[in-house]
Amino acid sequence: METTVLGVQPRIIKKNDAEKIRKSGNVPAVVYHKGEETVAVSVNELELNKLVHTAESHIIDLRFPDGKVKRSFIKAVQFHPVTDRIIHTDFQLFAADEVIEMDVPVSVTGESVGVDKGGKLQILRHNLTLKGKPTDMPDHLVIDITDMEIGSIVHVKDIPAQSYENLEIMIDPETPVVSVVAPKVEVETEEAPEAAAAPEAEA
């Protein structure tokens, strides 16, 4: 899994502080680890967007102003309900040998025979939660859709074990992840005949 560096600025939580941070082009966030005190920080919105809106998961080295670097991953992201901008983020710290739960993006490879026949590919789960050591976490979970016909569904239990070796998928094995559905058939409706002209009133 790729590791990237993200600068953070410690902050003191005050009234209306979060809104001021957002107006300055940054995002309020917290950094936490089990058994440690939670630290309030802010991060650059543009840099954070690059990490959140990506097809791959990342290990993030949070760099503090004093030069300290703490290894983390994004645990939670809150979006504005209207603008869809990131309004808050949680970073979870971890040790190299620590077992964590992390959301990993789902990606597909291959050309589906069902799609070639006019079917539509649907990715039903864009992320799956994996449990294991950080060093074993993949950038994404790859699903080969080559043999998927119209009506085919790939469930969690169908994902090859080598895609997540030494890891556990923390979701019901029967959960559908990818499917190929039949195209919608548009039903042609005949135009209703024009209504007969109303008889003229007698003089």
Swiss-Prot record:
Cross-referenced Pfam families: Ribosomal_L25p, Ribosomal_TL5_C
Annotated keywords: Ribonucleoprotein, Ribosomal protein, RNA-binding, rRNA-binding
GO cellular component: cytosolic large ribosomal subunit
Presence of keyword Transit peptide: no
A Gene Ontology BP annotation from the UniProt entry: translation
Keyword Nucleus on entry: no
A GO molecular function held by the record: structural constituent of ribosome
Quaternary structure note: Part of the 50S ribosomal subunit; part of the 5S rRNA/L5/L18/L25 subcomplex. Contacts the 5S rRNA. Binds to the 5S rRNA independently of L5 and L18.
Function according to Swiss-Prot or TrEMBL: This is one of the proteins that binds to the 5S RNA in the ribosome where it forms part of the central protuberance.
Family: Belongs to the bacterial ribosomal protein bL25 family. CTC subfamily.
Protein name: Large ribosomal subunit protein bL25
